[in-house]
């Protein structure tokens, strides 16, 4: 049975967006790959000279739906962060506005990507939430994240060749 599944490389997609987006470039955003929330925190701690981040988690949550059209859903998390002076709430607010605008611009590209992906039977959930993290999550850094759910067809037909004789 063919194990190659249709997939979408969220990491490569957002790395490309960070490189091509004029706003991200002007604001000094750097791209990095992390492993979950812990990896995001570690990136913030170790990359002290970087002022703004777009981090895509290489981990995903998901499930398989056993319906008439079986599909696999994977949820990718993208973290955004921007440093500011500690205890400066005005600076934090300004950074959060920057993160919101970057999210908006990313979504304008994701609409186009969604149409392209549907031609390959890869479906992005239209509901993409933007979540701002508490000011105490990481001192001196405005942080937010959003998640994208990606659905792909999953072939669940029984194949006797995959099993030992019973």
Regions found by a protein language model. Give the residues of each.
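Short, cysteine-centered beta-strand-loop-beta hairpins and adjacent loop/turn segments enriched
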Residues: 63-64, 83-88, 153-159
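Small/polar-rich, solvent-exposed N-terminal microdomains that initiate assembly or binding
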Residues: 1-68, 161-166
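Acidic-leaning, charged glycine-interspersed low-complexity segments
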Residues: 18, 22-26, 49-51, 96-151
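Extracellular/virion structural assembly segments
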Residues: 1-12, 67-73, 81-108
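Oligomerization/assembly interface segments of phage tail-like spikes and tubes
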Residues: 70-85, 140-153
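A hydrophobic membrane-anchoring alpha-helix module
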Residues: 146-166
